[in-house]
Amino acid sequence: MVIRIENAVPPMILEYLKTCVQNEERWSYSYPKGAVFEKKHPKLTIYDGSDIPGAKFLEGMAHMVLLMVYNKALKDGLDVFQPTMLWCGASIKDKHRKDNIHTDHEKDVPKDMKVLKILGLLQDNGGHFLHDGEAHKMVPGTFLVFDPLKEHAATDIFTEKKRIALDYTVLAKTS
Protein backbone atom coordinates (compact mmCIF):
# COMPACT_ATOMS: atom_id res chain seq x y z
CA MET A 1 0.00 0.00 0.00
CA VAL A 2 1.17 3.52 -0.83
CA ILE A 3 0.07 6.50 1.25
CA ARG A 4 -0.09 9.88 -0.51
CA ILE A 5 0.64 13.04 1.42
CA GLU A 6 -0.39 15.82 -0.93
CA ASN A 7 0.76 19.44 -0.92
CA ALA A 8 3.16 18.79 1.95
CA VAL A 9 5.98 21.09 0.87
CA PRO A 10 5.75 24.44 -0.97
CA PRO A 11 7.24 24.51 -4.50
CA MET A 12 9.70 27.29 -3.61
CA ILE A 13 11.34 25.12 -0.93
CA LEU A 14 11.59 22.18 -3.34
CA GLU A 15 13.09 24.43 -6.03
CA TYR A 16 15.69 25.73 -3.58
CA LEU A 17 16.53 22.20 -2.44
CA LYS A 18 16.81 21.12 -6.10
CA THR A 19 19.32 23.91 -6.74
CA CYS A 20 21.33 22.87 -3.68
CA VAL A 21 21.52 19.18 -4.66
CA GLN A 22 22.32 20.03 -8.29
CA ASN A 23 25.33 22.03 -7.10
CA GLU A 24 26.55 19.29 -4.76
CA GLU A 25 29.85 17.62 -5.64
CA ARG A 26 29.40 14.37 -3.68
CA TRP A 27 27.24 12.47 -6.21
CA SER A 28 28.19 8.80 -6.67
CA TYR A 29 27.26 5.80 -8.79
CA SER A 30 26.96 3.35 -5.89
CA TYR A 31 23.34 2.31 -6.52
CA PRO A 32 21.79 -0.08 -7.12
CA LYS A 33 24.23 -2.08 -5.01
CA GLY A 34 25.75 -5.00 -6.91
CA ALA A 35 24.57 -3.81 -10.34
CA VAL A 36 26.90 -3.35 -13.30
CA PHE A 37 27.94 0.27 -13.85
CA GLU A 38 25.67 0.70 -16.90
CA LYS A 39 22.64 -0.01 -14.69
CA LYS A 40 23.61 2.45 -11.94
CA HIS A 41 22.27 5.97 -11.51
CA PRO A 42 23.60 9.04 -9.71
CA LYS A 43 22.74 9.10 -6.01
CA LEU A 44 23.61 11.64 -3.35
CA THR A 45 23.67 10.52 0.27
CA ILE A 46 22.42 13.41 2.39
CA TYR A 47 22.21 11.57 5.71
CA ASP A 48 23.19 8.05 6.75
CA GLY A 49 23.67 8.38 10.50
CA SER A 50 27.32 9.33 10.20
CA ASP A 51 28.97 12.73 10.07
CA ILE A 52 29.18 13.53 6.34
CA PRO A 53 31.59 16.43 5.82
CA GLY A 54 29.98 19.27 3.93
CA ALA A 55 26.46 17.83 4.17
CA LYS A 56 25.17 19.62 7.27
CA PHE A 57 23.22 22.28 5.37
CA LEU A 58 21.53 19.73 3.09
CA GLU A 59 20.90 17.49 6.09
CA GLY A 60 19.14 20.37 7.84
CA MET A 61 17.07 21.12 4.74
CA ALA A 62 16.13 17.44 4.45
CA HIS A 63 15.08 17.32 8.11
CA MET A 64 12.93 20.42 7.57
CA VAL A 65 11.22 18.84 4.54
CA LEU A 66 10.63 15.60 6.48
CA LEU A 67 9.04 17.54 9.34
CA MET A 68 6.78 19.35 6.86
CA VAL A 69 5.72 15.99 5.37
CA TYR A 70 5.14 14.59 8.87
CA ASN A 71 3.10 17.65 9.91
CA LYS A 72 0.92 17.38 6.78
CA ALA A 73 0.47 13.64 7.35
CA LEU A 74 -0.75 14.28 10.90
CA LYS A 75 -3.15 16.98 9.65
CA ASP A 76 -4.48 14.40 7.19
CA GLY A 77 -4.94 11.83 9.99
CA LEU A 78 -2.02 9.68 8.82
CA ASP A 79 0.16 8.86 11.83
CA VAL A 80 2.21 6.05 10.26
CA PHE A 81 5.89 6.99 10.63
CA GLN A 82 8.31 8.56 13.06
CA PRO A 83 9.90 11.76 11.71
CA THR A 84 13.44 10.60 12.40
CA MET A 85 15.71 10.08 9.41
CA LEU A 86 17.58 6.80 9.30
CA TRP A 87 18.77 7.61 5.78
CA CYS A 88 18.11 10.32 3.21
CA GLY A 89 19.32 10.75 -0.33
CA ALA A 90 18.60 12.29 -3.69
CA SER A 91 18.65 10.46 -7.01
CA ILE A 92 18.81 11.53 -10.64
CA LYS A 93 17.05 9.56 -13.34
CA ASP A 94 16.21 10.40 -16.94
CA LYS A 95 14.50 9.01 -20.03
CA HIS A 96 17.73 7.43 -21.28
CA ARG A 97 17.93 4.88 -18.46
CA LYS A 98 15.12 2.52 -17.58
CA ASP A 99 14.85 2.13 -13.81
CA ASN A 100 15.36 -1.23 -12.18
CA ILE A 101 12.53 -2.83 -10.25
CA HIS A 102 13.97 -3.41 -6.78
CA THR A 103 13.40 -3.62 -3.05
CA ASP A 104 15.29 -1.83 -0.29
CA HIS A 105 16.46 -2.75 3.20
CA GLU A 106 16.10 -6.52 2.94
CA LYS A 107 19.54 -7.12 4.43
CA ASP A 108 20.65 -3.87 6.06
CA VAL A 109 17.85 -3.44 8.63
CA PRO A 110 17.23 -5.83 11.55
CA LYS A 111 14.28 -8.16 10.91
CA ASP A 112 12.38 -6.80 13.93
CA MET A 113 12.73 -3.18 12.76
CA LYS A 114 9.88 -1.95 10.54
CA VAL A 115 10.91 0.85 8.21
CA LEU A 116 9.13 2.85 5.55
CA LYS A 117 10.40 4.85 2.60
CA ILE A 118 9.19 8.35 1.78
CA LEU A 119 9.65 9.65 -1.76
CA GLY A 120 9.03 13.04 -3.33
CA LEU A 121 10.03 14.80 -6.54
CA LEU A 122 11.84 18.12 -6.48
CA GLN A 123 10.40 19.11 -9.87
CA ASP A 124 7.88 17.90 -12.46
CA ASN A 125 9.38 15.54 -15.02
CA GLY A 126 6.75 13.42 -16.73
CA GLY A 127 7.52 10.26 -14.75
CA HIS A 128 5.79 8.53 -11.89
CA PHE A 129 6.37 5.73 -9.36
CA LEU A 130 5.62 2.01 -9.56
CA HIS A 131 5.03 0.12 -6.30
CA ASP A 132 3.94 -3.50 -6.03
CA GLY A 133 2.71 -3.42 -9.64
CA GLU A 134 0.67 -0.22 -9.32
CA ALA A 135 1.62 3.17 -10.85
CA HIS A 136 1.32 6.28 -8.68
CA LYS A 137 1.29 9.79 -10.09
CA MET A 138 4.11 11.96 -8.79
CA VAL A 139 3.91 15.74 -8.55
CA PRO A 140 6.22 18.10 -6.68
CA GLY A 141 5.03 18.73 -3.12
CA THR A 142 3.32 15.34 -2.85
CA PHE A 143 5.22 12.62 -1.01
CA LEU A 144 4.56 8.88 -1.07
CA VAL A 145 5.05 6.62 1.96
CA PHE A 146 5.58 2.97 1.10
CA ASP A 147 6.92 -0.39 2.20
CA PRO A 148 10.46 -0.71 0.78
CA LEU A 149 10.28 -4.52 0.92
CA LYS A 150 7.73 -4.47 -1.92
CA GLU A 151 9.09 -4.13 -5.46
CA HIS A 152 9.24 -0.54 -6.69
CA ALA A 153 10.81 1.65 -9.38
CA ALA A 154 10.50 4.94 -11.19
CA THR A 155 8.28 4.69 -14.26
CA ASP A 156 9.64 5.78 -17.62
CA ILE A 157 10.43 9.48 -17.84
CA PHE A 158 9.09 11.18 -20.96
CA THR A 159 10.71 14.62 -20.86
CA GLU A 160 14.25 15.74 -21.62
CA LYS A 161 14.68 16.91 -18.02
CA LYS A 162 16.47 14.82 -15.46
CA ARG A 163 14.27 13.79 -12.55
CA ILE A 164 15.57 14.59 -9.09
CA ALA A 165 13.83 12.77 -6.26
CA LEU A 166 14.34 12.94 -2.52
CA ASP A 167 13.88 9.76 -0.54
CA TYR A 168 13.99 8.93 3.14
CA THR A 169 14.12 5.80 5.24
CA VAL A 170 12.19 6.26 8.50
CA LEU A 171 10.87 4.07 11.30
CA ALA A 172 7.29 2.92 10.91
CA LYS A 173 4.91 3.44 13.81
CA THR A 174 3.84 0.02 15.00
CA SER A 175 0.91 0.90 17.24
Model-derived segments and spans:
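Non-heme Fe(II)/2-oxoglutarate
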Residues: 1-81
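Substrate-binding/catalytic groove segments of enzymes
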Residues: 27, 126-130, 152
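Conserved short histidine dyad/triad with adjacent acidic residue
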Residues: 90-110
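Short coil/turn motifs at secondary-structure junctions
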Residues: 95, 125, 171-175
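Short beta-strand His + acidic residue motifs that chelate non-heme Fe in jelly-roll/DSBH
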Residues: 99-104, 151-159
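A short beta-strand-loop-beta hairpin characteristic of the jelly-roll/cupin
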Residues: 113, 121-139
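A short hydrophobic beta-strand segment most commonly corresponding to one strand
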Residues: 116-120, 160-175
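Conserved metal-binding segment of the jelly-roll/cupin
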Residues: 137-152
